[in-house]
Amino acid sequence: MTVLTDSDILIEVSRGRDKALVSQWLELAQSDALILYSAVSAAELWAGARPPEYTALDALFEALLCVPIDATLGRCAGEYLRRYRKSHAVELGDALIAASAVERGARLWTRNRKHYPMPELAFYD
């Protein structure tokens, strides 16, 4: 199984406050699952990070595989924006994250499902 983690999950894992979520994270990490993150999520986490959090963020990102943004993801995200920007207020970052999951055949782990109305997108619980 391949799982792409959304920014909200990565934030909670890096801060460690939600014990149930951290437990679920550890269970996933110890399985044979491939855990991915989007370059968009990296940008969002680094933008909000404080210096005492830098080492933990470096360790978190080093343990996972980054999905880089390329032309294929750009096209897919652009299609999502065209389809869902007005009806669901989908923003560029969420469109790129959804495209990353769909193009990699990954399930998206997020607590913000309303940001992702794409029917072809599978979720991880």
Task: Give residue ranges: language-model regions.
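Acidic, PIN/NYN-like endoribonuclease modules and their adjacent C-terminal/linker elements
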Residues: M1-T2, A98-D125
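Short, well-structured N-terminal submotif of metal-dependent ribonuclease cores
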Residues: M1-Y37, W46-E62
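Histidine- and aromatic-rich ligand-binding microenvironments
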Residues: D6, Y37-S38, V90-E91, N112-R113, ...
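Generic structural signal for small/hydrophobic residues in well-ordered secondary structure
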Residues: D6-S7, L45, A77, A101
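A generic structural signal for short hydrophobic patches within well-formed alpha-helices
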Residues: L10, A42-L45, G74, Y116
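Residues at secondary-structure transition points
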Residues: A20, L36, V40, P52, ...
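Short, hinge-like loop/turn segments at secondary-structure boundaries
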Residues: P52-A56, Y84, D125
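Active-site neighborhoods of divalent-metal-dependent phosphate/nucleic-acid chemistry enzymes
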Residues: L65-R111
